[in-house]
Amino acid sequence: MTMKFPQYFSLLIMSSLLFACSSESDSETEKSGTPAIITPVPLDTYFPPITRTDEWETVSIETLGWSENQVDNLYTYLEDNDTDAFIILKDGRIVIEKYFGDFTKDDNHAWNSSGKNLTSMLIGIAQQEEFLSITDATSQYLGEGWSSLTIDQELSISIKNQLTMTTGLDYNVEDAFCTDPECLIYLNDIGTTWYYHNAPYTLLDDVIANATNTDFNSYFSEKIKEPIGMQGLFIKVGYNNVFFSTARSMARFGLLNLNQGTWDDTPILLDTAYFNSMTNSSQDLNLSYGYLYWLNGKSSYRVPGSEVEFTGSLIPNAPADLYAGLGKNDQKLYMVPSLDLVVVRMGGASSEILLGPSGFDNELWGLINEIIQ
């Protein structure tokens, strides 16, 4: 088993990561002599077993009527852009599963900010279980003095502000990941600006732990990881709480999202209103952002590290209803309800190091379109 993460984190991670890896089977598509024109076969949604994680149904590109002769172009692009793992699910079944270099299906990789999706869903579950409400003041769970704000300013910040990147805290501090009170300084009134600020997001882990009176990893394992057969662990890396897992575990979570919080017949997130808010525009400052989810198909968007609003869709080549977890160094989890697709990409940065969206998204979807259309 190997793990992918910055070298200077290796000692910390290797001493902490004790979870089991999946031993999942290969899923190369079959080739057979068939007519040039193929009628796609409608498929019901499939859910891989949660107790036998090496078992996962596949469906061939040929059966779906996709273009197999475009797959090599995709693989070349992925390999040229430092990809470790790539998966496409259609109706829950594996269509494409490819690993590069020494990376295998059993290896674990950092999700980086794609893991924000996990935290967002866990907040929804905690609300559904009445441990908290997203309209509650953050101070209710972190106590007075969690920031350098006045008491009244602290009380004005809600969990929803943390979910939507609208806390108004100063993102120009020396370390925007720092969650110490001296790093959390007033800049703008809540709800008046959108800025991708990691520190307020990270504090949601403490909100969940204190609201549920349990360990954050334990609550996540009980409510999401174990019920859907995921493997993995959140590990503290500096101020950040980073999730590590196999690519297939990321695909499982994508499938849970695609089915709106239900795994097979087991409801995980029952609150449909929360799920809909989570995966739709959560405010009018950045239409392409829900509750820690990135959204495609909107008229404008903002990106990490910038105060500029850009016109147009976040990923023009991708379906308009796509929503996603987008992490540093191009960790990607895409869900497309209209096509019943989940797409996973793990690896290194394709070019410059960015915290979320990048040009890689649009280039990748251009190549995926050549296969599925």
Regions found by a protein language model. Give the residues of each.
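Active-site helix/loop module of the DD-peptidase/beta-lactamase fold
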Residues: 129-167, 214-246
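Bacterial N-terminal signal peptides that target proteins for export
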Residues: 1-10
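Active-site SXXK
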Residues: 92, 109-135, 162, 204-208, ...
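C-terminal motif of bacterial Sec signal peptides marking the signal peptidase cleavage site
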Residues: 17-20
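Penicillin-binding protein/beta-lactamase superfamily catalytic region
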Residues: 229-337, 350-358
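A small/polar active-site loop signature that marks catalytic segments
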Residues: 164-240
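N-terminal leader/targeting segments and the immediately adjacent pre-domain N-terminus
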Residues: 22-104, 109, 127-132, 164, ...
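Short, well-ordered beta-strand elements
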Residues: 339-348
